């Protein structure tokens, strides 16, 4: 830190959590710290009484560093940034909730299909009379199996291919995605190995992030986790976080807070609990409000807060794990539940689907009461939605 630096910004840079719901605008009075040594250039504020000021209390957002300084940071932020929790999924209730939702959707005629599968191949070993390169040997075997012209083998698979083929005596399993036009090879294993096709579903809330890992072959939930959203130190509501992104390097800071500090540690902890390598997660689904979608993808969200409130996207299929630094299989496709408005996001799309409002003749009201609140009203004939602030009072 240097003389003249803002204390709240210095604390954020050092990953010290200070409760600042207004993101440092001096409006909420929550970022209180106590001066224990050294000197701060602090503005007087109505949030700190004269008596408290004499005892060293200051607002971090209204304080500049003069020289070496020691401050006490109260453990206020822990109320927001909860510790990570990995849930026990052995209870019948957890299984029943998921099964009920899945069955209700399927009963309407919607087919839940998985475009990923594991294929087992036995190839002839190369000889002096058969000197075909490894990758062509693999694609030839896959082409016979699937009768597809275009087969894509990414660098990560190509790099491990020679060793896996020879260790397995050319008897392998491949994790592939098949479309009407082509096939993509995600991974390759010895045929003797048990292969789990992992899928990751994440709900990015303004305050809390929840996630599950599933077995994409069986639909079984393998692990579940929740954690406070690391972005909380940049503001409790979406508007203050958008404002934070307008500062130099702000978009990257907000993206790192939700991915590097929140989602990736959750992935590692869940994978550790079920003994699943992270690179065996081949698909990711994200449901979140429109602002969180933009911040997750590292896309400028500033135009969401000013008229006419236009997002960069409602839906996108162009995102992959390696694009945003999600630590799973780098070629994993990230599917984002589509937003339907500037402040009505993919979390509501997903919730509406599962709540079955769209398939019922009677009127229903679906409410997602989070920091950003959304409501959907309607039935099988129509649905309408709106959003409201449901977090900090000054929002």
Please identify what each model-predicted range represents.
Residues 10-14, 19, 29-80:
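Iron-sulfur (Fe-S) cluster-binding segments and ferredoxin-like electron-carrier domains
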Residues 25-29, 61, 374-376:
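FAD-binding core of FAD-dependent oxidoreductases
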Residues 202-206, 211-239, 303-316, 350, ...:
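Glycine-rich phosphate-binding loop of actin/hexokinase-like ATP-binding domains
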Residues 52-55, 59-201, 206, 218, ...:
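Nucleotide/phosphate-binding catalytic cleft detector across ATP-hydrolyzing
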Residues 1-44, 211, 225, 266, ...:
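N-terminal cofactor/phosphate-binding cores enriched in small/glycine residues
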Residues 30-32, 280-290, 369-371:
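A glycine-rich phosphate-binding loop feature that marks nucleotide/adenosyl-phosphate handling sites
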Residues 43-52, 335-339, 392-395:
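Short beta-alpha connecting loops at secondary-structure transitions
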Residues 230-273:
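N-terminal phosphate-binding loop and adjacent alpha-helix
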């Amino acid at each position: 830190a240097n003389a003249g630096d803002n204390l709240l910004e210095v604390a954020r840079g050092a990953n010290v959590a200070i409760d600042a719901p207004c993101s440092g605008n001096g409006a909420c009075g929550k970022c209180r710290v106590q001066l224990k040594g050294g000197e701060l250039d602090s503005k007087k504020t109505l949030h700190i009484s004269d008596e408290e000021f004499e005892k060293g209390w200051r607002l971090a957002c209204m304080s500049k560093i003069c020289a070496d300084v020691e401050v006490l940071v109260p453990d206020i932020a822990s109320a927001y940034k909860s510790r990570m929790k990995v849930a026990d999924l052995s209870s019948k209730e957890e299984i029943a909730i998921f099964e009920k939702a899945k069955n209700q959707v399927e009963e309407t005629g919607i087919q839940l299909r998985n475009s990923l599968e594991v294929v087992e191949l036995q190839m002839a070993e190369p000889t002096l009379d058969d000197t075909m390169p490894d990758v062509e040997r693999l694609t030839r075997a896959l082409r016979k199996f699937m009768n597809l012209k275009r087969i894509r083998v990414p660098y990560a698979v190509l790099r491990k291919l020679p060793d896996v083929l020879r260790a397995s005596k050319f008897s392998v399993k491949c994790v592939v995605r098949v479309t009407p036009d082509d096939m993509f090879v995600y991974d390759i294993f010895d045929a003797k190995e048990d292969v789990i096709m992992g899928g990751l579903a994440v709900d990015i809330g303004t305050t809390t992030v929840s996630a599950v890992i599933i077995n994409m072959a069986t639909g079984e939930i393998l692990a579940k986790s929740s954690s406070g959203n690391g972005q909380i130190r940049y503001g409790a509501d979406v508007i203050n976080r958008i404002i934070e992104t307008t500062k130099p390097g702000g978009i990257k800071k907000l993206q790192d807070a939700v991915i590097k500090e929140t989602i990736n540690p959750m992935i590692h902890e869940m994978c550790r609990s079920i003994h699943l390598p992270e690179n065996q997660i081949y698909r990711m689904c994200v449901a979140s409000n429109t602002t969180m979608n933009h911040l997750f993808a590292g896309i400028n969200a500033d135009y969401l807060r000013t008229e006419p409130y236009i997002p960069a996207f409602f839906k996108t299929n162009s995102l992959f794990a390696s694009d945003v630094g999600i630590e799973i299989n780098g070629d994993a496709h990230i599917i984002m539940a589509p937003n339907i408005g500037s402040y009505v996001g993919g979390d509501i799309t997903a919730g509406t689907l599962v709540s079955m409002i769209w398939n019922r003749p009677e009127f229903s009201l679906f409410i997602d009461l989070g920091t950003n609140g959304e409501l959907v009203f309607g039935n099988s004939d129509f649905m309408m939605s709106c959003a409201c602030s449901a977090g900090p009072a000054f929002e």
